[in-house]
Amino acid sequence: MTSESQQHEAACHCGAVRFRVRLTDGFRTARRCSCSYCRMRGAVAVSAAVGDIAFIAGEENLTLYQFNTLTAKHWFCKTCGIYTHHQRRSNPREFGVNVACLEGVSPFDFPEVPVVDGVFHPSDAATGSRVVGILRFEAES
């Protein structure tokens, strides 16, 4: 994985969508969400400010999905279906970026990934974001 101060090259699976992104805090807040949608999507996301993603190619190849409050915006490649990023409901000035799209990064690079509560969303409660579990990966020897 590269340092947090560097820009990361990123792409969907088929390469139709390509972008550069600067992460807000490197990989320190890599996380999953427990909401009904993210539970099915299964991606590990890292953070970037809305202005810190620049599309190199294929922005027109993205399709948008929204549900429930229509606040969060989830983008996917129309060709291969890979989720690239989403605008967060908890902070609309921030994107969650799929780590699997980042060049040289895999979700399996993270031995532990916190799972934040998306069922009782921080926007719906005064308690703010909370961790409801930890997803662990241990490679076979």
List where the protein language model places each region.
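A short Gly-Trp-Pro
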Residues: 1-11, 16-141
